[in-house]
């Protein structure tokens, strides 16, 4: 089944299994995933909890046959902030999940979680921005694929593109970030059917 190419971004957007973009096999790709944000988006779509999400299928979908330089997963580290059994269960569940990702070859980058009036991640976006910039300077990749939704990363994306690298924004077709799509070289938008195929 082929899906229409979206016209919300320039120069080209990809939806589902159809794309108008040639991918040289020698092209080096680094994938940056904001884990907390991706979890929320999947949960909104009924994928989590109760189902497993196949990150290997997501990576294959984003690579499209190109060479993987590295895949990075950024997340706030859960703490037992109130010394309860429930919080400890959450700590252990996250550690188990991240260990499983490491076995799949992911580099795990941990930020902090602040517990005040609401639970907030801190430091994750900064880590992504720094790694995007350093990776472009040190020629670690030709293309950065960013699975994010925070427009605070736009300055880093603009800098990376100014150095002759490409940045692909990967989001969900129902609610893409128009700001990130506009500033990126390419947008890859997952349709509901794509997400369903990645859920075990």
Regions found by a protein language model. Give the residues of each.
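Domain-level signal for Mg2+-assisted phosphodiester chemistry and nucleotide/NA-binding surfaces
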Residues: 2-3, 9-120, 166
């Amino acid at each position: 089944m082929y899906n229409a190419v979206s016209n919300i971004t320039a120069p080209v957007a990809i939806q589902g299994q159809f794309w108008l973009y040639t991918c040289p096999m020698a092209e080096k790709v680094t994938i940056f995933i904001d884990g907390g944000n991706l979890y929320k988006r999947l949960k909104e779509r009924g994928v989590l909890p109760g189902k497993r999400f196949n990150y290997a299928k997501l990576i294959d979908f984003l690579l499209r046959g190109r060479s993987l330089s590295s895949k990075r997963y950024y997340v706030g580290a859960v703490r037992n902030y109130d010394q309860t059994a429930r919080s400890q269960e959450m700590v252990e569940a996250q550690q188990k999940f991240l260990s499983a990702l490491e076995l799949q070859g992911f580099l795990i980058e941990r930020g902090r979680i602040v517990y005040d009036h609401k639970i907030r991640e801190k430091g994750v976006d900064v880590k992504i921005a720094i790694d995007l910039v350093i990776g472009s300077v040190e020629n670690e990749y030709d293309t950065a694929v960013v699975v994010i939704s925070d427009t605070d990363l736009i300055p880093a994306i603009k800098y990376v593109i100014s150095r002759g690298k490409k940045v692909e924004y990967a989001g969900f077709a129902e609610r893409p970030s128009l700001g990130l799509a506009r500033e990126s070289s390419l947008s890859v938008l997952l349709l509901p059917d794509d997400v369903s195929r990645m859920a075990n």
